[in-house]
């Protein structure tokens, strides 16, 4: 099946994600190889080895060894698949920075943009579904966002994007054993078991936006029209800022297409998400590891403030405020 539209998928990989990145790359490989015809899909990755925020525990491994391991994994997983991969070392570089620049660069080159994420597994049907969706809606709604379904979330506001087989399950705080739970680490075979049995897509339209950044899809016309991540978002909350920009500029007139019965896995509490970080313990979960760094909560709070005060007269914080304030 030949794809009729052009795509770009971009992912920032932090050096400490080295032990889990192979899973994302394998899912990406599966999605590319699932296409049985011509396809124009630009794969973009940034490998961030800057240590201004987190430092490598050199008693365990060196940055050179991490870099060698990363590029070996990329070559193994993507094999003959074309990709662009570049390394950042000199400056602090966050998910907000990467996604902003990815949008700016590729919106002029492709029809559809997708945000990859190092702790995600994308469905192998991804690009066929998105190609058919874009071809179906581009004449009447050339500006849109889209989202595959996700696991059981913590409150009812997420119901519109929960997978149809997950949404009637209970949310159990801290649960790592049940397959529908937020903290459960799902593998590719488990994801495929849900997606491969789908015979007819359940695509729903919502205008009260609900998404996170993991796997967010947007038509390039959305970015060309001025929706992007503001530079005031220097750390996190970039997905929320993008959503607020979308609401502010278009007042809910741009649809969000939710592919309700196709699961995109977000292993947000992956047990290997933060490896070899100096000062963190193997027993730390993702949140616990981050909070061992004095700067983290301050940067998170300041980025949160910037996100929710974009449209009023309020101070914009930067990394300088985090370290010197």
Q: For each predicted feature, which ranges?
A:
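A conserved hydrophobic helix/loop-capping motif in glycosyltransferases and polysaccharide synthases
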Residues: 7-24, 31, 48-50, 149-150
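Catalytic phosphate/metal-binding cores of nucleic-acid and nucleotide-processing enzymes, i.e., regions
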Residues: 14-24, 86-87, 96-98, 126
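Short, acidic, metal-binding catalytic loop of nucleotide-sugar glycosyltransferases
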Residues: 23-41
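Active-site-proximal specificity loops/subdomain of glycosyltransferases
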Residues: 52-110
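Conserved catalytic core of nucleotide-sugar-dependent glycosyltransferases
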Residues: 103, 123-227
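Short beta-strand-to-loop acidic/aromatic patch adjacent to the donor-nucleotide binding site
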Residues: 109-121
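Short, high-confidence coil segments that cap the C-terminus of an alpha-helix
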Residues: 110, 139-144, 253-254
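C-terminal catalytic/acceptor-binding lobe
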Residues: 198-221, 225-325
